[in-house]
A protein has these predicted regions:
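Cytosolic, long alpha-helical scaffolding segments
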Residues: 1-161
């Protein structure tokens, strides 16, 4: 790289592309895990929580589409929208966690399916986090600004209030 004397933009694009490829690979790993866990739910009773997971997955799908569009067009405004959407996904995940705990406490028969649903939801939430990482990489590549500190890392599902 240094033999060709790349400009700062070239280096930022290269670093960002490497980070983005890693995030995309992790997203694929989470998707594979979701598919494996989904097979275990075919014989389980359908819980209302699965509707929340559906809404959460639609939001994350939109985030993925938007972040890929932002990458293709170097659109930092769209990338910022993806970052802002992550908070909603995190809130849905926390709400779902509490809902699933309630189902498990109400009836022991719900423990297995609730556990699978929880891990599916966690994987969807992590896919959203990786979409947000990609959005941050886009902003860095285009503007040279690292948006670190904008969002809180980790989730609040296990925090005691």
């Amino acid at each position: 790289i240094s033999l060709r004397q790349p400009m700062a933009l070239d280096l930022r694009n290269t670093v960002s592309a490497l980070k983005i490829s890693n995030d995309l690979e992790r997203m694929g790993d989470y998707a594979a895990n979701i598919a494996k866990r989904s097979k275990n739910l075919f014989t389980s009773p359908v819980l209302e929580a699965s509707l929340t997971i559906g809404r959460m997955s639609l939001l994350v799908q939109k985030m993925i589409k938007n972040v890929l569009d932002a990458y293709a067009s170097n659109d930092t405004v769209l990338a910022q929208e993806v970052i802002e959407s992550d908070l909603e996904v995190d809130l849905m995940h926390t709400s779902l966690f509490r809902e699933l705990i309630t189902y498990m406490m109400e009836d022991a028969k719900n423990i297995s399916s609730s556990t699978h649903l929880f891990f599916i939801a966690k994987n969807i939430e992590r896919i959203g986090d990786h979409a947000t990482n990609i959005a941050e990489s886009i902003i860095y590549a285009v503007d040279g600004i690292s948006p670190q500190g904008i969002r809180q890392k980790g989730d609040s599902a296990s925090n005691v209030e």
